[in-house]
Amino acid sequence: MKAIVYTTNAGSTEQYAKLLAQKTGLPVYSLAEAKRTLSSGTEIVYLGWIMASTVKGYANAAKRYRICAVCAVGMGQTGTQVDVVRKKNAIPQQIPLFTLQGNFDVEKLHGVYRFMMQMMVKFAGKGLSEKTDRTPEEDDMLDMMLHGGNRVCIENLQAVLDWYKNC
């Protein structure tokens, strides 16, 4: 592996990319920087943010680089939604996929994504708040929707770091 490449919208993915770079010693680039710096076919770890189960930037990165692992950052708890994200993005089974819980602040989102998330919070939040048998994961999601949240932490990267040590 030669580098860490990421796409971010509100900053969580960039935070994870930089934490991972600190722990691995690999250089870190935004996808735009990587296109100017890295050769086509370079082995990378790709980090992207999740929107409707789609890992933003993954398709472009996969066309250009040899992706050794994918880290998808979203609102769900770390380690959840792996099967859905893998299927939606057609990530091959042999490529490790890690989901990481990021931060959530509607005000940090840009453009249409802010509007979409405001609507999601309004409707999904209402449905979750009315649900009487919420799981702990649903309680956490509701809390993030209603109050925002900072969930980026090195502990969420442990499975990624374990994989990296063994590859």
Predicted regions and their residues:
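Helix-loop-strand module that forms the ligand-binding subsite of alpha/beta enzymes
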Residues: A32-V112
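Helix N-cap / beta->alpha transition motif
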Residues: S30-A32, C153
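Glycine-rich phosphate/pyrophosphate-binding loop and the adjoining helix
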Residues: M119-C167
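Short, charged N-terminal beta->alpha structural module
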Residues: M1-Y29
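Loop/helix-junction capping segments adjacent to catalytic residues or to phosphate/diphosphate-binding pockets
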Residues: G11-E14, T78-G79, V106, I154
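Short, solvent-exposed beta-strand-terminating loops
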Residues: G102-L128
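Short, mixed-charge, low-aromatic patches
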Residues: T13, T42-I44, R114-M119
